[in-house]
Amino acid sequence: MTQNNQKEETSVTDTPSHRSQQAIRAQNQALILAAAEEEFVLQSYRGATMQGIADRAGLPKANVHYYFKNKKNLYMAVLRSIIQEWNEGLVTMTVDSDPKTVIEKFVRTKLHQAFVNPSRHKLFAIEVIGGAPHLHEFMSTTMKEWVHDKAQVMKEWHKQGKIGITDPLQLLILIWATTQRYAEFEIEIVGLMDK
């Protein structure tokens, strides 16, 4: 074997130029998603425009189309990022987990998210109140499977005597309702708390 054959080939995707392009892509996508989230909250899905999102992101409209193709794809990306962030608190939940620790962490995480970024909750609420036209399929498949998986773990906890909850779905709904209330009705909550 020659010395040249022994050398590892450098992949085109592992060059400094490619890594730089990936970093720019990630940065642009993050800028666009943040701008889109703001625009959708302020203007609604119907009122938001790709130009408005581009202006808010400080990027050319062509970049927004390059990364997300159209408004619907961008809106779905924003909604999915919201759901993904919310559900992170229960990702590592297993039958061997301590229910008190898991549920407490989930509630604290959800409350923190509601206080830090209430607009995300408002955007999701607007979508759901409107009949979830963009999320209906996602909610009836991916989200439903996720909830079912978490409910199964909670049922196992109940069988093991770790929790007294017999209907885990109702517990999840109660946690969502309670934590999201702080964001969706921020004006009311702040007024009641004299803040």
List PLM regions with ranges:
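Helix-turn-helix
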Residues: 2, 31, 39-73, 77
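An amphipathic alpha-helix adjacent to DNA-recognition modules
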Residues: 26-34, 46-47, 67-91, 140
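Short helix-capping/turn signature of helix-turn-helix
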Residues: 68, 126-131
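Amphipathic alpha-helical packing segments from all-alpha helical-bundle domains
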Residues: 84-91, 116, 133-159, 170
